[in-house]
């Protein structure tokens, strides 16, 4: 009942505000001009995403004197893990192919109010352990869908309601679409936003409902950014995560489809600094620093081994952790614009009977960083693709610009745990560690990105990981991961 009510209220509010804007425009000589060019500029500002491929001149038509624009992309992604593990890529898959069609429509209803609707048709095909062949899983996925109001009532504040995109520069905090209301404002040098988010329905048609880990979770997201000098900025972040779902009790039987292992009330705060200094023509030094702290409390629900649907224990503990990620990138004044990167990430660690001091990320992150390349890729390596928790990660990278707008990068990662533990948090594959050593291992990624055409994007990744002493008997074993992605925009 909540979703229809919210939609109805939003439509009523939109009708009222649109009518108010129409009246204001009739008497306000400063109202923005209604032109196709203005609509196009607004569309690009509100909908442009780094992880999507779009043409600069999409299909458009005139409706009631305003421009309706339709665009999208077709994408094919394939990834493979070797050797096959008990739990490799995404829930036991050792190979995964995804074919998708994404389409979107943008329409400026008035000079101040705009609508955007995005949807995806997708199909996944996977091979699992033992060469068990699975058929295609087809689904419809809702993407961004929102109503945007610019400087509503002349307040200088923008309002957005619907399924919104949240992301930061390095995806260290956020890279997710959420059902939310967001208010934002600012100037050329300063900007801020405040949002409230809660999932109102399932995001894909092949899901039974809202993800149990997202059910009844309310988030408050705040951000403020200041460009204090040219090419130098500082951003402040805050995220309050409140899980209001009912925590299961010992002995309770819960269907596997609705298992929720964690109910948490957490708050993240932190800052991001970034800048670039031009040393001489075609030579520059880029730097970044991300710092964060998380605190709150969590209830961990444990299920039985022999009765996997029965709750056997509920562990309650405090969460106190911190993390930092810093790096430098030096671009040399040589043919091919070679660049050298050095980065280091560190987190807190330690667990007592009532307090977990290991940092964990927001759960909305993706840890993608461009390292000066044509497109961003996995900050902490593609084979492990782990979450920054109880870790020390040293990174060395070298990259080149090839052709006109493409790139090739070779990146090395060295992984160590802050304290010995028997698991890695949210890694691509599950493998029990000994808990006796901190050396997780090392990884090497080769990443190629081709962007020579406005419409076509090709990405290829070859990654390898060598297990360290923390893997015990598996130390020295190599794991390999490969991925190819093709996107064609329209």
For each predicted feature, which ranges?
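C-terminal structural cap/anchor segments
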Residues: 346-439
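Bacterial N-terminal signal peptides
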Residues: 5-14
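Surface-exposed loop and membrane-interface regions of Gram-negative outer-membrane beta-barrel proteins
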Residues: 80-99, 107-159, 166-175, 299-317, ...
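Extracytoplasmic loops and strand-loop junctions of Gram-negative outer membrane beta-barrel proteins
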Residues: 53-55, 84-89, 129-130, 164-165, ...
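Outer-envelope exported proteins of Gram-negative bacteria
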Residues: 71-73, 116-118, 237, 288-290, ...
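Signature for the C-terminal beta-barrel architecture of outer-membrane proteins
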Residues: 153-158, 167-168, 172-354, 401, ...
């Amino acid at each position: 009942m909540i979703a229809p009510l919210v939609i109805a209220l939003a439509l009523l509010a939109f009708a009222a505000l649109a009518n108010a804007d129409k009246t204001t425009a009739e008497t306000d000589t400063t109202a923005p001009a209604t032109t196709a060019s203005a609509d196009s500029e607004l569309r690009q500002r509100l909908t442009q995403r780094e992880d999507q491929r779009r043409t600069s001149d999409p299909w458009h038509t005139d409706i009631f004197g305003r421009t309706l624009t339709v665009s999208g992309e077709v994408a094919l992604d394939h990834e493979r893990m070797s050797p096959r593990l008990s739990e490799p890529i995404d829930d036991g898959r050792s190979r995964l192919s995804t074919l998708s069609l994404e389409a979107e429509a943008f329409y400026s209803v008035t000079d101040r109010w705009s609508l955007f609707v995005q949807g995806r048709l997708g199909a996944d095909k996977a091979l699992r352990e033992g060469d068990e062949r699975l058929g295609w899983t087809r689904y419809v996925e809702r993407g961004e869908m929102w109503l945007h109001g610019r400087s509503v009532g002349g307040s200088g504040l923008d309002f957005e309601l619907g399924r919104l995109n949240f992301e930061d520069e390095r995806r260290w905090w956020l890279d997710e679409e959420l059902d939310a209301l967001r208010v934002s404002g600012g100037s050329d040098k300063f900007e801020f936003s405040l949002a409230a988010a809660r999932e109102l329905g399932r995001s894909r048609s092949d899901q039974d409902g809202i993800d149990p880990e997202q059910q009844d979770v309310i988030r408050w997201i705040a951000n403020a950014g200041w460009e204090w000098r040219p090419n130098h900025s500082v951003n402040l972040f805050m995220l309050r995560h409140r899980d209001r779902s009912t925590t299961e009790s010992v002995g309770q039987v819960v269907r596997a489809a609705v298992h929720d292992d964690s109910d948490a009330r957490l708050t993240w705060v932190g800052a991001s600094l970034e800048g670039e200094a031009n040393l001489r023509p075609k030579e520059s030094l880029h730097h970044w620093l991300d710092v964060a702290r998380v605190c709150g409390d969590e209830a961990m629900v444990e299920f039985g081994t022999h009765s996997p649907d029965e709750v056997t224990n509920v562990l309650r503990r405090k969460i106190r952790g911190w993390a930092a990620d810093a790096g430098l990138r030096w671009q040399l004044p040589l043919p091919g614009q070679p660049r050298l990167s050095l980065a280091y990430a560190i987190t807190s660690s330690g667990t007592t009977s009532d307090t977990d001091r290991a940092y964990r990320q927001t759960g909305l992150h993706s840890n993608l960083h461009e390292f000066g390349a044509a497109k961003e890729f996995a900050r902490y390596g593609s084979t492990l693709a782990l979450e920054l928790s109880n870790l020390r990660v040293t990174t060395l990278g070298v990259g080149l610009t090839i052709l006109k707008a493409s790139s090739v990068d070779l990146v090395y990662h060295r992984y160590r745990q802050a304290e010995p533990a028997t698991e890695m948090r949210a890694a691509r594959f599950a493998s029990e560690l000994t808990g006796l050593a901190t050396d997780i291992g090392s990884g090497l990624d080769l990443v190629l990105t081709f962007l020579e055409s406005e419409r076509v994007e090709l990405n290829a990744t070859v990654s390898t990981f060598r297990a360290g002493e923390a893997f015990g008997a598996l130390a020295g074993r190599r794991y390999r991961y490969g991925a190819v992605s093709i996107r064609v925009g329209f």
